[in-house]
Amino acid sequence: MLHQLTLAEIARALADKRFSAEELTRTLLGRIRQLDPQLNSFISVTDDLAIAQAKAADERRANGENGALLGAPIAHKDLFCTQGVRTSCGSKMLDNFVSPYDATVVEKLAAAGTVTLGKLNMDEFAMGSSNQSSHYGAVKNPWSLDRVPGGSSGGSAAAVAARLLPAATGTDTGGSIRQPAALTNLTGIKPTYGRVSRWGMIAYASSLDQGGPLARTAEDCALMLGAMAGFDPKDSTSVEQPVDDYLAALQKPLSGLRIGLPKEYFGAGLDSRIADAVLAVVEELKKLGATVKDISLPNMQHAIPAYYVIAPAEASSNLSRFDGVRYGYRCDAPQNLEDLYKRSRAEGFGSEVKNRIMVGTYALSAGYYDAYYLQAQKIRRLIKNDFVNAFAEVDVILGPTTPNPAWKIGEKNDDPVSQYLEDIYTITANLAGLPGLSMPAGFVDGLPVGVQLLAPYFQEGRLLNVAHQYQQVSDWHTRTPAGF
């Protein structure tokens, strides 16, 4: 069953010539055609490109190359620019946009030999926590087809969880890798801000966005992140720091690891069954040699209001470039330039995107800048300081990834704040720029739940190490949704 293999298993099998990259690619493309109509996880399937890349990978291997990702099939969240392939960002605005270049992440993974099966569905312009705001329709959670897979990287999560492919790229602005990973039983990592290049990654909130992988295991995430990470002179926020050997980091024993449990993560609003699952993970980590300490992150309560000022403010600026002039959707028969701008944007953007543009424009407007935007940035500094203080005492911070398991499609549509609250545990890592990882922690009523790990800047290896060691003594990550 080729579709059940992890990236690491695929690497070993290709090296042993048990099958070819082309054979694997054709198998998974057939699986996507057969099963994705149930999920709606792909916006574009790139059959011809994938088969050409698979043949090239087989040729490279025949010539003596043996990279871990050579011939590995993946797909990209549809906000990474891909040369010659539509890059829609889940929006009508970019429905006809074919990128003339590859994003750095796409380029780096292609250089490592990966095979691109297609582009994955997402919340429009990455704005959402449930993958319901996409112009191409909602993505369904393979664990329960009437429920959301999380967002905004919901297509990436659903496709990997349903074994349509072993790994995918995602992006995380307020939890958009970690939250869908938790709701679909995957491992997903948001690297430190500046660790992975944002060049060619269509921006939502530039000071918060960060690309990363979703896969089934920490080992697979280590393989992906090793290829994605690194300095990029084309991205002014990219950090010139050597990339750790994430695979080597996996093997370290956890003896002496200090884990912090923030009391704010276990308060009102958390499903008690998720709290039990998280504490069961803590007990296993203690058996592996870790010690546990209660800590406090006192400013966490202000994270959601601060985030929903900063992110929309940056979005209102970033999305001003979509005006119907150079590329993207253009309204029919505009009367004049102003009419072109107004109607192209009114018709091209969906309601959630328009909501956030309006909030952001308001927060940045002359009379309100100090009261909202400046205040939110001050709170951001306090949140960052809380983490600096906490990491003086502990090595990793652990808690739930989400307060609830996946909810039903449409259930929270009339109450956007209840959707925003699903990101309460993930947003702080983006505001502070810290690395965060979600890994499978069990099930509640048959629905997956995740545990989140946070570490100091550029300590992705430590997160992957803890997750990998836990996955050696647990089997949650091996469970597959029925029918897939």
Swiss-Prot record:
Entry-linked InterPro entries: Amidase (IPR000120), Amidase_CS (IPR020556), Amidase_dom (IPR023631), AS_sf (IPR036928), GatA (IPR004412)
One CC-aspect GO term: glutamyl-tRNA(Gln) amidotransferase complex
Enzyme Commission numbers on file: 6.3.5.7
Stretches of the chain forming a coiled coil according to its record: none
One GO molecular-function entry: glutaminyl-tRNA synthase (glutamine-hydrolyzing) activity
Entry function: Allows the formation of correctly charged Gln-tRNA(Gln) through the transamidation of misacylated Glu-tRNA(Gln) in organisms which lack glutaminyl-tRNA synthetase. The reaction takes place in the presence of glutamine and ATP through an activated gamma-phospho-Glu-tRNA(Gln).
Residues annotated as the enzyme's active site: 77, 152, 176
Keyword check for Protein biosynthesis: yes
Quaternary state and interactors: Heterotrimer of A, B and C subunits.
Disulfide cysteine pairs (residue numbers): none
Listed name of the protein: Glutamyl-tRNA(Gln) amidotransferase subunit A
NCBIfam families cross-referenced by the UniProt entry: gatA (TIGR00132)
Species lineage: Bacteria, Pseudomonadati, Pseudomonadota, Gammaproteobacteria, Pseudomonadales
A Pfam family: Amidase
HAMAP family: GatA (MF_00120)
Record-stated family: Belongs to the amidase family. GatA subfamily.
Protein source organism: Pseudomonas paraeruginosa (strain DSM 24068 / PA7)
A single GO BP: translation
Record's keyword terms, sorted: ATP-binding, Ligase, Nucleotide-binding, Protein biosynthesis
Primary enzyme class: ligase
Record's signal peptide: none
Gene designation per UniProt: gatA
Catalytic activity: L-glutamyl-tRNA(Gln) + L-glutamine + ATP + H2O = L-glutaminyl-tRNA(Gln) + L-glutamate + ADP + phosphate + H(+)
